[in-house]
Amino acid sequence: MWRKLEAHLGPEVSPHLLLESHFDELRACGLSRQKQGYARSLCEMVISGELTFDALPEDDEEAIALLTRIKGIGRWSAEIYLLFAEGRPDIWPAGDLAVQAGLHKLLDLEERPSEKLTRQLAESWSPHRGAAAIFTWHCYNNAAL
């Protein structure tokens, strides 16, 4: 999808260019009507200055709160963005089913933990919960070490 957007809009995909694109053009790039709505909402927030990715709050919970104000972005999406795009070391996506399943396997729990229990189990791993998340994903896809 991203390659198709770059082919249509050029290598510097900008909010302005995306907003100027017609529905059918974006549909041909793989964006459904719903995804286009989310993308347009995001572009409008960036253009208006309501959202500046270079100036997200340093506090992880504040950054998550700001990102989840974007239509179509939930807590999981915000956490994944902060972990991988921003490299924030203490992000723990406790609602991620693979994190829960990996933790279940890693800690030899009787059942997959709930989101609440997943958060509680990782409290002592702060400020390195991002690394723990990556490790639990590994354990989900592979044998535990």
Predicted segments with their positions:
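C-terminal accessory module of base-excision DNA glycosylases/AP lyases that mediates lesion recognition
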Residues: R75-L145
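Alpha-helical ds-nucleic-acid-binding substructure associated with the helix-hairpin-helix region
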Residues: M1-R69
